[in-house]
Amino acid sequence: MDRKVLIIVENLPVPFDTRVWQEATTLAANGYTVSVICPKGKGYTEEYEFLQGVHIYRHDLPTEGNGAVGYAWEYWSALSNEYRLAKKCYKEVGFHCIHGCNPPDDIWMVARLFKSKGVDYIFDHHDICPELFEAKFGKATGLLYKSQLWLECQTYKHCKFAFVTNESYKKIAIERGGMKSEDVFVLRSGPKLERLKIQPAKPEIKRGRKYMVGYLGVIGQQEGIEYILKAADYIRNTLKRDDIFWGIVGGGPHLEALRKQCKEMRLDDIVEFTGRVPDQQMLDYLNTADVCVNSDEYNAMNDKSTMNKILEYMALGKPIVQFDLTEGKYSAQEASLYAKPNDAEDMAKKVIELLENPERGKQMGEYGRNRVVNELSWEHTSKALLEGYDRYFKNRGL
């Protein structure tokens, strides 16, 4: 009998969500029947598609909530669509389990409605929602914060086993979620090397500057892009250097606000916000960069989270500057310099240190590339995905 898995992701469409798409296509390539339910997004508007062996069901993206009532409506709208499409998928394709990808921590509710049909819930822990709430709103109190803790607890209570992105998340699954260690699989979001190809630099991107600093990622309120602007301002106006171009690649809800801030700081001639761009343009920018930065500030969320951008920089052989965060340091190790937490001036100094020592930067980049090739690429990390599902289905006699 076929092993059938339904993956539900609430906040991003596939194939755009790299981790979820890699999971889905890896399972499909290994003989599983895989379906995905996700929201629609820019460029991903078809309600049904069959891509690379994966059935994709999409629903309209709910309006982003604000406040208790707004969040409740947003989550209810998403859950209603997920349940509607799950019923459709169960009838058309079928599934033995629902693999829920947070945030938010509510997809177990959909799985509960199929429990009478023998469907189990598998949790894929992408973000620690209580810490995300604290980072976003600056407090770890109140009804909404307590609701995040309750939802996380219920998620682990109802899941058969879990995938987590790193050891910090595994510790949370055990200590806060009450999971057994053997039921928590560390599935790191390793990059696929065929997607991240090292290519010749394109000097014209630098706008006539000698050096370039690159950034790739979501442009949101929690990503700390303001630290990059402050670092660029410090280098230009305090160190009196005007030979560095900053290329910030990615889209997100904070993009226009940061473009406005950049212009107000009179940095728009040396800092470019590209917005969301095709993969080839992203590769052009990162391959041209001399140094790449990660501006995620120190907080409880970021300190425990693995950022995909770090591994992508490493895959392209780039030396990195980032703040001193636990999981960021585990990923990059000797491929990065570590600035004092939330200190834009120290970040700027670390950037200059690497730009003025290109041989050291080259060695760091080679170290990072080798670490990804030999340990952290999806080819290696995906073994945990297959191990977890193979054990699960064998226990079901499938």
Walk through the language-model features, giving the residues of each.
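N-terminal subdomain of nucleotide-sugar transferases
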Residues: 1-44, 48-56
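Conserved acidic donor-binding segment of nucleotide-sugar-dependent glycosyltransferases
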Residues: 336-344, 353-359
